[in-house]
Amino acid sequence: MAKLVLSLCFLLFSGCFALREQAQQNECQIQKLNALKPDNRIESEGGFIETWNPNNKPFQCAGVALSRCTLNRNALRRPSYTNGPQEIYIQQGNGIFGMIFPGCPSTYQEPQESQQRGRSQRPQDRHQKVHRFREGDLIAVPTGVAWWMYNNEDTPVVAVSIIDTNSLENQLDQMPRRFYLAGNQEQEFLKYQQQQQGGSQSQKGKQQEEENEGSNILSGFAPEFLKEAFGVNMQIVRNLQGENEEEDSGAIVTVKGGLRVTAPAMRKPQQEEDDDDEEEQPQCVETDKGCQRQSKRSRNGIDETICTMRLRQNIGQNSSPDIYNPQAGSITTATSLDFPALWLLKLSAQYGSLRKNAMFVPHYTLNANSIIYALNGRALVQVVNCNGERVFDGELQEGGVLIVPQNFAVAAKSQSDNFEYVSFKTNDRPSIGNLAGANSLLNALPEEVIQHTFNLKSQQARQVKNNNPFSFLVPPQESQRRAVA
C-alpha cells in the first residue's frame, strides 16, 4: 500500500519539479504582434464558447490556448478535462463549480428530503465538494482533472481560460484537447487540429474526423462494455454515449427548474483570506462504522495536498491589491506563494486597473510569457523586442488579447476612464522588472554608471534615477501637478 501511495504521489507531482519546456526558437522570433480577437464561436443550448486560434505564432510562442465561455441562466457546462493545466478567470457573474479528483473521498452529502419522490426514497447522493465562484475569481484546474460549472443567477457568467499546452504534464503534442465526459458536441479546438493536419490528411482521414466530431469520451466504447462497467441497461448506455442528444444541446445545457446540489455559502470578500482555515475543517468520511469525522492531520498526504486544497482566489477589483495608487490604479497578483494550487499548474495571474491617462511603466517579466486579456476599457500599449524594435504599438480594447513573450518590454497607458485587464503568466512565481521609476533597474544602478552608459551629464543621470518616485503605476501628469501645487 505504501508503494502504491508513493507511486501515485510521484505520478501527480513528477512534472512539477522540472523546468518549463522551452518553445521552438523560430516561434518566438516575432517582428510584429497584434491584438487578437476570437475567431471561432460554438453555440450551445445554454450559452456559447469562443476560441482563439492556437496555431497563431504568438500562441505557439507562449505555448497556450485561450477560450471564453458564456453561460446563461441555469446553464451547465458539461464536465470535461484537458491535456494541460488550466487557469479560469471569472470576468462576470456568480455560480458554482466542481472538480473531480481521482482517489479523493466524496465528502458532500445531499439532504435526505431532497431525495424523496412520493413514498419512495432513494439513497442519499454523495459527491466531491462543490465550490462557489464570483466575479474576479481565479480558478486553478490541474491537468486531466474533470470540472464542471453552473450559473444559478440571472447575470450571464463569462469565464476566460487558458490551457498551458507547453506544460511538461502534457505528454501529447502542443494542440489543446478537451475531453468531454458527456454530450454529443463539437470539441472547440477540433477545427484548429483539422486545419493543422489538413495538408497531409487523406480524404478518408478527413471523413473520419467529421464522423468523430461531436463525441464524448464514452461514445467510443462498445455499448456492451459500458453496460457491464456501469451495470445499467442499454437505454442508459445510449444516453451516456450521447445518442439521444438534441442537435443544439452542445457543451452547455440548460437545466430546467435549476440545479439542486449542496454548496457552501458564498463568503464575504474580507473572508477570502480565511479560505485555508475553511479547507481544514473536519470532514465526514463514510466507513463501515458510519460517518467518521477526520481532521486534516489524520488524513494521508495525498488528501492534505490534493483533496483539500483551495481551488480559487479572488484577484478582481474587490480584492486587496498588492500595489495601489489612488490617482493611478491598482495591481493584484496570484502566485503559488499565496495560492498554493498554482504550484501544480506552474501558472499565475495578475489583475490590473488603470485610471484614465495613468501609465504602467515600461517593464518585463523575467521568467514567463504574459497573455494579456482586456476586461474593460482600452489602453495604448507598446511592446519592444530584443532588437529594440517596437513590435506592437496600438490600442488594446475590451475582449482583445495581446501576448507578450518573456523578456519583451511592455508599457501601457489607459485611454478610458478605467482600463481593466487580467494577465495570465506561464510561471507560478513570475518576477517583474520595471525599467523606470522607483526600484527600477536604472534606479538601482550607480549614478556614474548611468552617466557614462547613456552619455549623460551628472545632473541628467540624477534626473533619470530620481524624477519618477512611483514604482509601477504613474498617475496622470495633471494629477501630479495638482499634488505639487
UniProtKB/Swiss-Prot annotation:
Q: Where in the cell is it found?
A: Endoplasmic reticulum; Protein storage vacuole
> What's the main place this protein lives?
endoplasmic reticulum
Which domain of life, per UniProt? Eukaryota
Question: What Pfam families does its record include?
Answer: Cupin_1
Does this UniProt record's set of keywords contain Isomerase? no
Q: Where is the composition biased (Low complexity)?
A: 192-205
Spans annotated as Disordered: 108-130, 192-215, 262-298
Q: Name one GO cellular component term.
A: endoplasmic reticulum
Q: Which residues form a coiled coil?
A: none
Domain Cupin type-1 intervals: 33-238, 313-462
Q: Which InterPro entries match?
A: 11S_seedstore_CS, 11S_seedstore_pln, Cupin_1, RmlC-like_jellyroll, RmlC_Cupin_sf, Seed_Storage-Functional
GO MF annotation terms: nutrient reservoir activity
Give residue spans, biased composition: Polar residues.
Answer: 108-118
Describe the subunit structure.
Hexamer; each subunit is composed of an acidic and a basic chain derived from a single precursor and linked by a disulfide bond.
Q: What is this protein called?
A: Glycinin G2
Q: What is the lineage of its organism?
A: Eukaryota, Viridiplantae, Streptophyta, Embryophyta, Tracheophyta
